[in-house]
């Protein structure tokens, strides 16, 4: 409602600076924030313009109430617009202090000698007017400016010739409060949002029924690539897949086409020479095998597992054909990566029939292959003669001569049998489920039998299983058990004793005492709340019987002698 913008009047008080000016020579005046009061609206007690801008005519220098244009602020409709950031992003900072170009400093090294002259700081004489913008009553007729710059208030005229308020005709077509827009921001819009129309084909321009054309597809050229007007740039994941496909396809110089004049080496070297006529023992239908060798096919010649040249059995000494560094033959029981046939999903038969192989002459008359079933012949992973231990002692049993795979007719087994263990296999456990039940959720398995259901609550109790030694309670020797003697004749009906012996610490119950019939009938007929004296001893009970007898005797004598 009030325009409280401060007005700075310190520009008139500034003067010139001295010749030599440094950072600590001048002080930049900062305007003081005065407390604003509400007693004068529109800052009417402050000056309207700066003091040094004074016109010769006081009427032009100080505007009156009619000089303000209020219609621009009144008829400006606020609202109805979206929030727009109309403020500048980078503001231009203007300092109130003097800048670097305001000083005239001589350059160093010159012969310019200037006389220090102190510049007069006296400001120019100017007339200052301090007239409130809204005059109060009695001061609305203006002021008179004298020659000595003094201000005198004008007196009101004796008669007023102006028209009164009844002669004015203010035209208020509509109130200014109705000009304030109070709706939504898009309700003031006069235009209508139009849909964008594209110049594409309509629904009837398409040809749904397409004619089938016979296309000849080339492997190296993609189909329908001619209608692409842009180059095909694969994405990252597509480029990785394309590179992997290129690795599997060999290049132009990678093929080795065999000619019909090339000499083909024989692949079967272990077959006997007598069986080479017309190949009678060759397989009729050979399995489809991949020409790619398995990972364990090749032997590295640079390592210590290099196989020496074969010698005949007559010239090979003991242990000459054995491997120098033996491996663990237990680790080769399972087939390797190259032993599977993907087309038939079975393991390749690496061990052929013994009668198809050429009998090799070896020392000590042993014709058993050294390698295991799942290991190739040239691997030499099986144990040698030096790996066996001779069992000393005389054995009653004969050697197992029927075992054709026993090396050197040894009674020791080549492969130790796997003992059947009662422990389950590693894959039988569910580690995640057991961890969650024991550490996270603490859930117990439900009982699986009727007996377990009865005892299930005992395992869930919080009481300790083994109680400690209780020293406060009585011991076994404290009690005095009464031993009942078993009689020959069993009496089903037993009359209770009239006078029983009780212990000293015995407290009588409600049925311990018995009243006489005389007192019993009198209590039932005459009284309802009677507290009987409790007798803890048997003497008091006997005394009650004696009193009862004396009263009965006294009543009999009274009937006999009424006077």
From Swiss-Prot:
Transmembrane segments: none annotated. Residues 131-163 are annotated as: Disordered. This is Sperm-tail PG-rich repeat-containing protein 2. Keywords: Repeat. It comes from Rattus norvegicus. STPGR repeats lie at residues 21-34, 63-73, 97-107, 200-219, 250-263, 292-321, 334-353, 423-438, 473-483, 507-518. Pfam families: SHIPPO-rpt.
